[in-house]
Swiss-Prot record:
Keywords attached to this entry: ATP-binding, Hydrogen ion transport, Ion transport, Nucleotide-binding, Translocase, Transport
Record-linked Pfam families: ATP-synt_ab, ATP-synt_ab_N, ATP-synt_ab_Xtn, ATP-synt_VA_C
Any single Gene Ontology cellular-component annotation: plant-type vacuole
Function: Catalytic subunit of the peripheral V1 complex of vacuolar ATPase. V-ATPase vacuolar ATPase is responsible for acidifying a variety of intracellular compartments in eukaryotic cells.
Reactions it catalyzes: ATP + H2O + 4 H(+)(in) = ADP + phosphate + 5 H(+)(out)
Protein family according to the UniProt entry: Belongs to the ATPase alpha/beta chains family.
Protein's organism: Gossypium hirsutum
GO molecular function: ATP binding; ATP hydrolysis activity; proton-transporting ATPase activity, rotational mechanism
EC number(s) given by UniProt: 7.1.2.2
Name of this chain's protein: V-type proton ATPase catalytic subunit A
Iron-sulfur listed as a keyword: no
Length: 623
């Protein structure tokens, strides 16, 4: 192994007994079968071959073990050594995670690029995930020697960056009486900052902890979620809301805008931290995230502008990286998310895309000669998906002080040809609570975000009712009315195609016009403009209120005039006489949230009053 990567492994190997080694018997792509592995455990981490490739045991039979290797296996030979490490695949958790970019098994890509000077990851490279020499500003809580600590207790804070305070917690499986706690100061991840004594045994702790990726981190209790995940996308916030701690799926064919929605969630959602996992997607998309995010800023409540990258961690496992590591990347991402949740933060995890993860499962399953199920996917696909999505939720964290945290999972799904009956999509939909279905036809019409409002749904609407009641008591009825208008438009479209628009009743013409307003000027949103890239919830509510108000007033005016002898009020008359109000309705989306909430709400209220006055004047004229 080149000296440049440190001699940590070499010394470890030299001290090992011969019994710690097995030998390669068979190589089939990323799957390696090794003999002489008696005593090994399932999911144990191993080092394969003379290059020390990282692998994980996925099947045991007699003294032979089947290993999935997370690196390119070209050049491995029969009888190459396989070294056992006696520990599962784990991630390092501590200060330094945020703003970093890792590969699927938590190797820091920036560090590897600097050390190797290569554009590709060298085989067998072993670099610590977090920088052990960097110094962090350690501030202990008001506790001292003799105090008792239990698993999950927060005993110090570390200044991670100007956006996030990093709380240092005791690992969930530790407890005892404090015999030493470091005074405030600068410490690295190697330095002992805490010593506990339990049943006469003393144990030292650093700010770093490791956790096996396949094991969910323990919590005190799971709670019912009741706070919305505000994404800044009108169609999602208003019609199909998710909650902090929810599970969402974004299935859609290629070119429908899954990645743009995932990135918008990362940039603008009301989460405290974001873990973005690029799992088997194009490398350019991760490069785009790396270029965009450091330049993007978010405005904090105290008016400070901070880079979005300071609250983001990227796990990049692009399509040209080894297939087996895709499976690990999802678990790496969710474990990092759970770590920040345990500090009391609301974390969002974007998995783009879970279909590529399922394809990795299918490939490994095929190499193991397991019985294929639907479309060649393994029979345990639904169980694996469920075990991943079940790690989401709002929880009461372990230890003190009492705090709640949440992990929201948003999984993009790429069904081949946009077919939602694909096994991955149907298995995902049986688990998740929110379905944002993207439509190829809408994308072809350049209607973005291309969320189909007729097939999408959210099962969290009931859980959020108390929030909406406090925010705006009218919102639920306004949303119901808007949905009815969109549904009615779909029914009328068939009639229009048969007999034309002119044959419709006046009220139906108004319904079609309102639906067009909702579709083109409310649900469609331009992610690349300063005024529309992010829509605050109050703006979404007021825009919808004014459009629904116009619909109600127009229908009322037509129905009132229908029974009178005077001039009839028709849809064309309304459009002709109230053209400027109509134009103002269309232009609501151009109001820039940067002007502030008060200024915008005043404008929307004025429009609402002008609509009422305009229709009243029209009714008086035609009497």
């Amino acid at each position: 192994m080149p000296a440049v990567y440190g001699s940590r492994l070499t010394t470890f190997e030299d001290s090992e007994k011969e019994s710690e080694y097995g030998y390669v018997r068979k190589v089939s792509g990323p799957v390696v079968v090794a003999d002489g592995m008696a005593g090994a455990a399932m999911y144990e981490l191993v080092r394969v071959g003379h290059d020390n490739l990282i692998g994980e045991i996925i099947r045991l039979e007699g003294d032979s073990a089947t290993i999935q290797v997370y690196e390119e296996t070209a050049g491995l030979m029969v009888n190459d050594p396989v070294l056992r490490t006696h520990k599962p695949l784990s991630v390092e958790l501590g200060p330094g995670i945020l703003g970093n970019i890792f590969d699927g098994i938590q190797r820091p890509l920036k560090t590897i690029a600097k050390r190797s000077g290569d554009v590709y990851i060298p085989r067998g490279v072993s670099v610590p995930a977090l920088d052990k020499d960097a110094l962090w500003d350690f501030q202990p809580k008001k506790i001292g020697e003799g105090d008792l600590l239990t698993g999950g207790d927060l005993y110090a804070t570390v200044f991670e960056n100007s956006l996030m305070q990093h709380h240092v917690a005791l690992p969930p499986d530790a407890m005892g009486k404090i015999t030493y706690i470091a005074p405030p100061g600068q410490y690295s991840l190697k330095d002992t900052v805490l010593e506990l004594e339990f049943q006469g045994v003393k144990k030292q702790f650093t700010m770093l902890q490791t956790w096996p990726v396949r094991t969910p981190r323990p919590v005190a209790t799971k709670l019912a979620a009741d706070t919305p995940l505000l994404t800044g996308q009108r169609v999602l916030d208003a019609l199909f809301p998710s909650v902090l701690g929810g599970t969402c799926a974004i299935p859609g064919a290629f070119g429908c805008g899954k990645t743009v929605i995932s990135q918008a969630l990362s940039k603008y959602s009301n989460s405290d931290a974001v873990v973005y996992v690029g799992c088997g997607e194009r490398g350019n998309e991760m490069a785009e995230v790396l270029m965009d995010f450091p330049q993007l800023t978010m405005t904090l409540p105290d008016g400070r502008e901070e880079s979005v990258m300071k609250r983001t961690t990227l796990v990049a496992n692009t399509s040209n990286m080894p297939v087996a590591a895709r499976e690990a990347s999802i678990y790496t991402g969710i474990t990092i998310a759970e770590y920040f949740r345990d500090m009391g933060y609301n974390v969002s995890m974007m998995a783009d895309s879970t279909s590529r993860w399922a394809e990795a499962l299918r490939e490994i399953s095929g190499r193991l000669a397991e019985m294929p199920a639907d479309s060649g996917y393994p029979a345990y696909l639904a169980a694996r998906l469920a075990s991943f999505y079940e790690r989401a939720g709002k929880v009461k964290c372990l230890g003190g002080p009492e705090r709640t945290g949440s992990v929201t999972i948003v999984g993009a799904v790429s069904p081949p040809g946009g077919d939602f009956s694909d096994p991955v999509t149907s298995a995902t939909l049986s688990i998740v609570q929110v379905f944002w279905g993207l439509d190829k036809k809408l994308a072809q019409r350049k209607h973005f975000p291309s969320v189909n409002w007729l097939i999408s749904y959210s099962k969290y609407s009931g859980a959020l009712e108390s929030f909406y009641e406090k925010f705006d008591p009218d919102f639920i009825s306004i949303r119901t009315k808007a949905r009815e208008v969109l549904q009615r438009e779909d029914d009328l479209n068939e009639i229009v195609q048969l007999v034309g628009k002119d044959a419709l009743a006046e009220t139906d013409k108004i319904t079609l016009e309102t639906a067009k307003l909702l579709r083109e000027d409310y649900l469609a949103q331009n992610a690349f403009t300063p005024y529309d890239k992010f829509c605050p919830f109050y703006k979404s509510v007021w825009m919808m209120r004014n459009i629904v108000h116009f619909n109600a007033l127009a229908n009322q005016a037509v129905e009132k005039a229908a029974g009178m002898d005077g001039q009839k009020i028709t849809y064309s008359l309304i459009k002709h006489r109230l053209g400027d109000l109509f134009y103002r309705l269309v232009s609501q989306k151009f109001e820039d949230p940067a002007e502030g909430e008060e200024a915008l709400v005043a404008k929307f209220k004025k429009l609402n009053e002008d609509l009422t006055a305009g229709f009243r004047a029209l009714e008086d004229e035609t009497r």
